[in-house]
Amino acid sequence: GNYYEHNVIPKNGIKTARMLGHITYLSEEHMDSRFGRKFQDEGSKVEESVSFEVENYLQYKGEQFSELFDANSYILMTKVMDSYDAGKDKPLVEALKEVKAEFLIVGFYSDWLYPPERGKEIQIAAMNNNIRSSFVVLQGDHGHDSFLFSSKTYSNLITNFIES
């Protein structure tokens, strides 16, 4: 809504959206190894109703995000990301017909948002257009965020691709 006019920020909504989103960015393995079923230390609770460490972490991340990010920007960005489809009006292979670039497609086994199968679809469409492409799937414990964490293999892939 138009919260600017009323000077009321929809903090709970953006906080909840970030908490839900954050779960999909991380892998199940990472969440389990970091939090498991650990109960939250009473002295470091963000909210009184929080029982588990993972709840506290997500509450903290949501609170932090709600202070830094505008709710309308988040809504717009989410809609754009959700609705983008390179093959929306035609098959992906046709959408890539005019591409002159080479492709390096990197996926992570733990990524729930863009699983490796999506990368494979892009590579097949590229190959059907005689586009030089490489497709690699890496291990990463951080789900969709795996590319953000330092990885010598990931860095070497990108460096070799750019330099070749």
Predicted region positions:
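Catalytic active-site module of serine/aspartate enzymes centered on a nucleophile-bearing elbow/loop
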Residues: 120-164
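Conserved alpha/beta-hydrolase "acid-adjacent" motif
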Residues: 112-121
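Helix-enriched interaction subdomains in cytosolic or periplasmic regions
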Residues: 63-72
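Alpha/beta-hydrolase-fold enzymes
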Residues: 1-64
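Short, conserved loop/helix-junction motifs that constitute active-site signature segments
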Residues: 96-100, 127-129
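Active-site nucleophile elbow and catalytic-triad environment of alpha/beta-hydrolase enzymes
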Residues: 60-61, 76-95
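Short alpha-helical scaffolding segments that buttress acidic/His motifs in well-ordered protein cores
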Residues: 20-24, 74-81
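Short beta-strand/loop motif that positions the catalytic acidic residue
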Residues: 99, 105-107
